Amino acid sequence: MSDFRRNCIEQKLLVGTFAAIPHPVAIEVTAAAGVDFLCIDWEHSQISRERIEDLIRAADVHRVPAMVRVPGHAAEDIAAVLDAGAAGVLVPRVSTAEQARAAVKATRY
């Protein structure tokens, strides 16, 4: 189990931030600032799917877990960010149990 996951399960206080600038240097600077995690905001920024992996790797350089807020409920977007190495996925606008089940199902492959 990753330290990030363990800390979340143990409900430890973590400090993180959202990142919407689609450049690896911006992610590296933010990660180097000492945050416990980053959330790359794919939903509200103009980031290509190809760039997501670069941003996750930039956070990895500083051993900072990077979650990604995906643009919607599409299973292929959820799978893509996990394939790219995201430490977690934030799925927006989940309003029903069925949507939650579908999002969880998309993480299992």
Give the role of each language-model region.
Residues M1-Y109:
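Expand to "…catalyze enediolate/carbanion chemistry for C-C bond making/breaking, isomerization
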